[in-house]
């Protein structure tokens, strides 16, 4: 549920780089044909496999059977302590609000966070996606 098209564009570029599918959960803070989205994704956007769903319920239904890690600053477990395997789904919230509390509660055992000093409320969404995506690639031993 990104609010900022530039973040979504950068996330799309990261997805292309690591071979991941990008899911958007509506409502979005921009239109999917937004010029800022395309500019941030550069010419990689045409190579990005993506899909949009109407809400979190629809996303969890579509991803039933997939193992997930959810990223939230409210998690107890650090990203570095998680085991990633190919086929896992990484779920991130929106810049302004993060993941819905109901989703965090439902999947509490699957929630992870990046460490940060208490003076920082949150990290940039695109930076967080990039960091976690490449930690998973590192654990896989590289790209396929």
Task: Indicate where each model-derived feature is located.
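Post-transcriptional modification and biogenesis factors for structured RNAs
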Residues: 1-144
């Amino acid at each position: 549920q990104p609010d900022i098209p530039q973040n979504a564009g950068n996330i799309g570029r990261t997805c292309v780089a690591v071979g991941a599918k990008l899911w958007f959960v509506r409502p979005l803070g921009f239109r999917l044909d937004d010029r800022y989205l395309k500019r941030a994704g550069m010419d990689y956007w045409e190579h990005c496999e993506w899909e949009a769903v109407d809400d979190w319920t629809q996303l969890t239904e579509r991803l039933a059977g997939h193992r997930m890690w959810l990223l939230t600053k409210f998690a107890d477990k650090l990203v570095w302590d998680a085991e990633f395997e190919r086929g896992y789904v990484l779920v991130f919230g929106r810049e302004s609000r993060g993941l819905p509390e109901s989703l965090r509660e439902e999947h509490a055992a699957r929630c992870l966070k990046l460490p940060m000093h208490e003076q920082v409320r949150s990290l940039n969404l695109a930076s967080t996606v990039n960091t976690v995506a490449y930690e998973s690639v590192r654990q896989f031993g590289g790209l396929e």
